[in-house]
């Protein structure tokens, strides 16, 4: 039979009438900020954060232009702490998610003071990027009252064209990074809510091998910005509902729980040396 789940806040008084409809009264309780993780709250907040990252992905897919993003779903979305550490991600592309934290941290290092309404673009493989076609958009989330940087949202999408010596920007015989396409180290696309699309177009058109599909690049980057902004909006709503202290506390609990699970997984692997051989299309072994 179909099954649904209903979340009822801890302090809410509930009762059911003769038609089995729930009546709700009272004011929801705000979880306390403390150093002890509550397993129930941990699960609830983990799913709250994950749902925000997933909604970012839905926004990106629906607003993107290219087949690569809209249909192949070659993108990833995640939420980060104010220092660039990964909190939670949607179940997207693992190779993106494993490196995005380094990208966010490099942006923070380049721009010590990120202003509200700013948005940054990068695809630098030496700074957490996968390869040049994977373009990352980083958006800060500031506290509405203090203006303090409290979170960051980020999305990474594979652009089917970013320049280079061959269409598709994945040449197998490139001799340097320039032959693979346009390098974007750290470009401020939006400053205080004002977009610099002209500067982005100029950047994508620079160099001996510029992008062949600048309009598609700009459209998909706009979709990534929209995805990040949806995450910003939902995170602010979460803070308004539970308070910043509680949200930060639950983020810390999630990170500690993840670290503990990883330690337990590593302990479960017996000591020893492990070898694995895989093969290329022509049968050449990779050891």
What kind of region is each of these model predictions?
Residues 136-144, 154:
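A short, hydrophobic, proline-anchored segment that marks a local hinge/packing element in signaling
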Residues 1-6, 148-207:
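Gly/Pro-rich active-site capping loops and adjacent beta-alpha segments
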Residues 1-29:
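Terminal amphipathic helices with adjacent charged low-complexity linkers/tails
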Residues 71-74, 133-136:
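Short, small/polar residue-rich loop motifs at catalytic or cofactor-binding pockets
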Residues 65-67, 74-122, 239-287:
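Gly/Pro-rich turn-and-neighbor structural signature
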Residues 48-72, 108-112, 121-129:
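Short, basic/aromatic recognition patches
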Residues 26-59, 108-116, 254-266:
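Short, compositionally biased leader-like segments
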Residues 35-44, 183-262:
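N-terminal leader/propeptide and maturation segments of large enzyme subunits in energy/redox metabolism
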């Amino acid at each position: 039979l179909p099954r649904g789940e209903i979340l009822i806040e801890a302090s809410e008084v509930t009762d059911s009438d003769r038609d089995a409809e729930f009546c709700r009264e009272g004011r929801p309780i705000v979880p306390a900020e403390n150093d002890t993780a509550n397993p129930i709250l941990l699960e609830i907040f983990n799913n709250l954060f994950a749902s925000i990252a997933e909604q970012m992905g839905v926004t990106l897919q629906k607003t993107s232009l290219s087949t690569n993003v809209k249909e192949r779903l070659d993108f990833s979305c995640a939420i980060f702490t104010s220092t660039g550490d990964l909190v939670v991600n949607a179940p997207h592309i693992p190779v993106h998610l494993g490196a995005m934290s380094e990208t966010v941290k490099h942006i923070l290092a380049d721009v010590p003071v990120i202003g509200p309404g700013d948005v940054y673009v990068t695809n630098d493989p030496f700074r957490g990027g996968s390869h040049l076609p994977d373009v990352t958009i980083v958006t800060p989330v500031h506290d509405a009252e203090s203006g303090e940087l409290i979170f960051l949202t980020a999305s990474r999408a594979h652009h089917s064209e970013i320049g280079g010596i061959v269409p598709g920007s994945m040449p197998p015989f490139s001799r340097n990074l320039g032959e693979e396409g346009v390098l974007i180290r750290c470009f401020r696309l939006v400053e205080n809510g004002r977009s610099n699309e002209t500067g982005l177009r100029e950047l994508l058109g620079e160099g001996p091998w510029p992008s062949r599909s600048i309009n598609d690049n700009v459209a998909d980057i706009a979709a990534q910005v929209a995805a990040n902004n949806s995450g910003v909006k939902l995170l602010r709503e979460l803070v308004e509902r539970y308070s910043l202290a509680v949200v930060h506390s639950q983020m810390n609990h999630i990170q500690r729980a993840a670290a503990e699970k990883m330690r337990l997984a590593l302990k479960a692997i017996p000591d020893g040396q492990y070898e694995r051989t895989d093969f290329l299309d022509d049968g050449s072994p990779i050891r």
